Structure formats: structure tokens, C-alpha cells
Amino acid sequence: MEYRVLPHGGEQVSVIGMGSSVIGAQPEKEIIATVRAAVDSGVNYFDMAGGHAAIFAAYGKALEGIRDKVYLQIHFGADYTSGEYGWTTELAEVKRSVAWQLEQLRTDYIDVGFLHCLDEESDLAAYQANGVPDYVRALKKQGVIRHIGLSSHTPALVNKVLDMGIVDVVMFSINPAYDYGQGDYGIGENTERYDLYRRCQREGVAITVMKPFCGGQLLDAAQSPFGVALTKEQCIQYALDKPGVMAVLPGFGNQREMREVLSFFDASAADRDYSCLGELAPAGASGRCVYCKHCHPCPAGLDVALINKYYDLAMQGDNLAREHYLTLEKRAGDCVGCGHCDSRCPFHVTQSQRMQTIQTYFGA
């Protein structure tokens, strides 16, 4: 397992966590066994937004004695008191549902408390009018919540909440389909979505990724908007390469599916490579570096993807990105203009020219 740090807190989080959207259909015994197997495999981050209320009691049993070794995302607005998933912005219902979730989970604290499913302006307005954000902030002040988060599919709404300055974690849907405007949740232009990822990294807001496989559609050529099937390894690597991403949270339906997802760590760089998207993505994606590293290795020793990432972040106002860039052993000024990267870039970025632009910007 690999781990990344939650910037506002310092927790070490597994880069692959576990979503709970599908496992609720399993018997309690299988849920408990899968959660424990995940923990034994190094998974320490779990999202609790699922379609079934049954997951909570099962998780409570599975995590007994090891609660302090894992991190739970709990959603304010997801209501399970009826036995099935429901959504509410009413404060009394939010309080009742969260209290029920904590009781079932056998815990008295929340690692990340999420404002749940803000996809429209009216959602945020309703939460605010009913005092839900104030309630979440009060619980954080009391120590019940350690971090405040937000789950959304809409970049504009995420930016609006980021402006409030209360969020440490954003749960957002990242996959090639959505980033290129395909699918029900492909909300926002490609540039708007990438700007959001960079803003999160710049401000130290961690992104946890939901729907990395686009609900399984990307794994099936017949359903994929690209007309070809991608692999789980490609989708996971795609998400992990995006600025600000801390963890990817695919749903495991059972232990077999968990092992399949975690085999990502045994996959070769070639197996994880998603540069085929350069030939599949819409024309609007052409000419932008997506940090896929298909141009690597550089004959002159440059980390072309990282140089591009630092430049893009600096252009968004991240002063730390400039400092990080200047500490690189090889910088854009070391480019010899051989054209190796230009010929290999599946997104048709003329990297040799871009290195000149970056050298001029940073002065090195």
C-alpha cells in the first residue's frame, strides 16, 4: 500500500480507500470480512455513503478494536434512519441520522464530516438556510469532527464552498469520461475541472475520488463513451495523477473485488499507462499536459510531467509550486530540444516549446 498525507492534519491515508456504495447488498458476514481484509491489506480510509443502512452495523463490528487505525468519511445529509439511503437538508433530520450512524459504527467521533451531495445552488442554499454548515462547524469545535469535507460533482459549487474556507477534504468524481464532458456527472468544462484540482492542491485541500470507473462504464467497451474498455489500473492511475488527489475510493462488493482493485500495486507502469486517451478524448483535450508521463524517460533527465504540474500550479497562484520547481535537479532550462517528448505525447503537446515558456516564467 502507498500513502499520501492529508495536508490540513498530517494523517497518512492509503491512496486506495474503500467506497461503500455496493457492498451493502452483501450479507453482514461478507461485509465484515471484506472490511477487515481491506484493513489487513493496508486500506485505512473508508467512505460511508452507501445505498444500504446495513453497512453501518457491519462496519461497527468489523472495526471494533481498530477504530483508531482507520479514517471514516461520514455524510451530513445522507439519511439512513428509514433503512435505505435518503437525502435531506433539514437540520433535525441531519442530526438524527448522524447520531444513528455513530451509534451503529460504535464510535463517538468523525474523521471527516461531509456536507453531502451539493450539486446545485439550491442544495447549498438549503443547507445554509437550515443551519447545517453551522452545525458541522460547531461539532468540529467540540472535537466530534476532526475535518470538514464536501461531496459534489459540480466544480462551481465546490469553488463556492472552498471560498468559505472551512473545507479540508473534497470528495469529487474524477475519471476520463467526466473530465471530458461525458456521462451524467461530466459537469464543467475540462479546464474548469482541472483548475479545481489545482486549486485544491494549492490550498492544501485533499481530494478523495468517487466514481473512478464511471460506475463501471469505463471498464466495458459497450458502455464506455470512448468505445473501448479501460482497465481498473488505468482509471486509478488517471485519478491519482491529478493535482490534489489524496485517495481513490472504488466500491468493493466483496473480497474478490477488493483483491482485484488492490492488484493495482502489482501492475507494471505499462499496465497503468492511460496515454491511449490521447486518441480517444475530444478535440478540446488536445494540447494540454495531463501529467500522464507517456513522454518519459526524458533523454536529458527532466521530469516533464512534474515540471508541467508545477508550472500549471504556479500559474494558478501557488507560490509553493515555484519553490518546489526551483528545487528540481533538472528544470525546463535543461531541455536540449531533442523532440523526444513531442513525438511521444498522446495529447499533442509540443513539450519542447512548453519547456521554453516554463524556463522564461521561472527564470530557470
Predicted regions and their residues:
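Short hydrophobic/aromatic-enriched beta-strand-loop microsegments
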Residues: K69-L72, I166-N175, S268-S275
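Active-site mouth loops of central-metabolism enzymes
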Residues: G19-K29, F76-K95, E121-A125, D220-A229
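Glycine/proline-rich, positively charged
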Residues: D40, G86-T208
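Active-site beta-loop-alpha junctions enriched in small/polar residues
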Residues: S21-I23, A49-G51, H75-D79, L115-L118, ...
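Conserved, mostly hydrophobic/aromatic
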Residues: L6, M18, F46, Y59, ...
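N-terminal binding-site loop/beta-alpha segment at the start of enzyme catalytic domains
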Residues: M1-I74, Y80, D108, K141
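Short, well-ordered alpha-helical microsegments
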Residues: A53-Y59, P155-N159, M258
